[in-house]
Amino acid sequence: MALLDFFLSRKKSTANIAKERLQIIVAERRRGDNEPHYLPQLKRDLLEVISKYVQIDPEMLSVQLEKKDGDISILELNVTLPETEETTK
């Protein structure tokens, strides 16, 4: 019976298709808006300051902003510093 229903089923209306597409677009935009616009510049500035003191690969710096419970934001900064070879005196 399912096979018969498949062949006799009506096509989705264009309104339903448009609604589904809009829901997908809205969901993608909400997901993409989590990162503030200033975060890439903040990462560049931090990299510039750290580079004054230590040679560091840009891939070794990670900056993430996580929002929790509406009002709370957590800025996470991970820096992997290169190992230094200490010379004995």
Curated annotation (Swiss-Prot):
One of its GO terms (biological process) is regulation of division septum assembly. Keywords: Cell cycle, Cell division. It holds the Pfam family MinE. It comes from the Bacteria. Prevents the cell division inhibition by proteins MinC and MinD at internal division sites while permitting inhibition at polar sites. This ensures cell division at the proper site by restricting the formation of a division septum at the midpoint of the long axis of the cell. Belongs to the MinE family. This is Cell division topological specificity factor.
